[in-house]
């Protein structure tokens, strides 16, 4: 089975050789980069935001994982990693405190697109949030950035378009 994700396509468009090393040769870096780690940890906290005790336990688990890393990986993430994560997540909660929680989080999907040389090609991904409304479904997608992205980046983001098509395919509505 050939799995195609938004990340895989983005990697190929950014650098075909990097795509080859990562997805064909299956080589990976020894440790996750700060942006990837930060995004993963932020999403873990998002899933727990409706329950304060689970949120505290989740943050404690992230902290324990950080301190279990090798010294070099801790240096790569930075001394302020845990403080930055907590500060940014607390700011997020203040901004969205009056918003309702999503009906579904971390919705995984695999959609068969066809075959290539007899092998199935599957579009795969994880949708951060789904909100069910009277007028259909709303997709929530969270990204963490070092700098605030400009509107062109936000409008031209293909991930939300692909995920909208996936939701439409899976549910019959959007």
Question: Locations of the language-model features?
Answer:
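Short amphipathic alpha-helical segments and their helix-coil junctions
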Residues: 1, 16-29, 69-70, 139, ...
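Short acidic, Pro/Gly- and aromatic-enriched capping/linker segments at domain boundaries
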Residues: 1-9
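Metal-dependent nuclease catalytic regions and adjoining charged, substrate-binding loops involved
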Residues: 4, 63, 67, 71, ...
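Nuclease catalytic cores
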Residues: 9-52, 106-107
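Short helix-capping/linker segments at secondary-structure and domain boundaries
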Residues: 28, 49-57, 169-173
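Hydrophobic (often cysteine-bearing) scaffold residues that line and stabilize catalytic clefts
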Residues: 34, 38, 81, 85, ...
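A non-catalytic, helix-rich entry segment at domain boundaries
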Residues: 41-115
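Mg2+/Mn2+-dependent nuclease catalytic core
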Residues: 107-174
């Amino acid at each position: 089975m050939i799995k195609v994700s938004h990340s895989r396509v983005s990697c190929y468009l950014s650098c075909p050789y990097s795509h080859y090393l990562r997805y064909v040769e299956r080589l990976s870096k020894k440790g996750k980069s700060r942006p990837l780690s930060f995004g993963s940890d932020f999403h873990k906290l998002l899933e727990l935001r409706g329950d304060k005790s689970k949120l505290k336990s989740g943050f404690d688990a992230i902290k324990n994982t950080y301190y279990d890393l090798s010294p070099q990986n801790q240096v790569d993430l930075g001394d302020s990693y845990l403080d930055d994560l907590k500060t940014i997540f607390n700011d997020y909660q203040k901004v969205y405190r009056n918003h309702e929680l999503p009906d579904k989080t971390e919705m995984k999907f695999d959609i068969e697109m066809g075959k290539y040389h007899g092998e199935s090609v599957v579009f795969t991904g994880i949708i951060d949030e789904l909100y069910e409304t009277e007028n259909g479904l709303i997709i929530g997608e969270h990204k963490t950035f070092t700098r605030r992205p400009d509107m062109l980046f936000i409008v031209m983001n293909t991930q939300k378009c692909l995920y909208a098509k996936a939701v439409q395919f899976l549910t019959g509505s959007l």
